[in-house]
């Protein structure tokens, strides 16, 4: 039996006892019992009501938390879907740009009437890296007998820069890409890289990356696909060693 029912039972018995009491002292004693039982019952009832209120409050808090969490989960799912769509759109745009670049290079190459020279290597680089590395690499490759498209050797006064570079890209067996901090920040080398990527997709050339004072993480941030390619590193090999390794491919 619960305490509340026990208190009610005591109060009921006391009430009956008062009705049947024959002496005043017995009535007073039973009245005291009735008051105690009534107080105990009221206290127990209040405690039960307090507990019920606390349970209701906790249930309300839980419901509010679940509603907030559901909303947060919905927003997270929405953000993931938006990010996936953004990445998909970027990939689609980039693929379209590469296809357009490839088409442009083919059109330019077929439209020109002059005899086009073929090259073993096209060197894509930032101008800031010429003095420190690129010009020495170009000289070493040429000394080994390689035919290279290198702006300092190939471009002449009055040449169309875009047309000549498109011709060089289209007529080179390999595309050497000198990846550096300067390369990552320049638009023109990035356009050359897009052209080489288009050629590689079409099976017309191969990209040969050279890391020049950059880390794997820096390359991966710029281009995850380039970071996965086996690369030569100017921090590990000399210019002559790099040139010989490249020349062995032709």
From Swiss-Prot:
PROSITE patterns: TIR
Knockout consequences: Grows as well as wild-type in mouse C57BL/6 dendritic cells, decreased activation of mouse dendritic cells compared to wild-type bacteria. Increased host expression and secretion of TNF-alpha and to a lesser extent IL-12 compared to wild-type bacteria.
Compositionally biased residues, Basic and acidic residues: 30-39
Annotated Pfam families: TIR_2
Compartments where located: Secreted; Host cell membrane
SMART domains named in the record: TIR (SM00255)
InterPro entries (UniProt xref): TIR_dom, Toll_tir_struct_dom_sf
Domain TIR: 117-250
Gene3D superfamilies found in the cross-reference section: Toll/interleukin-1 receptor homology (TIR) domain
Function: Virulence factor that interferes with host Toll-like receptor 2 (TLR2) signaling, resulting in the reduction of dendritic cell maturation, inhibition of pro-inflammatory cytokine secretion and impaired NF-kappa-B activation in macrophages. Also acts on host TLR4. Binds host lipids. Has NAD(+) hydrolase (NADase) activity, catalyzes cleavage of NAD(+) into ADP-D-ribose (ADPR) and nicotinamide, also generates a cyclization variant of cyclic ADPR (cADPR), termed v-cADPR (probably 2'cADPR).
Free-text note on domains in this protein's UniProt record: The TIR domain mediates NAD(+) hydrolase (NADase) activity. The N-terminal region is required for localization to the host cell membrane.
Protein name, entry field: Probable 2' cyclic ADP-D-ribose synthase TcpB
UniProt organism field: Brucella abortus (strain 2308)
High-level lineage: Bacteria, Pseudomonadati, Pseudomonadota, Alphaproteobacteria, Hyphomicrobiales
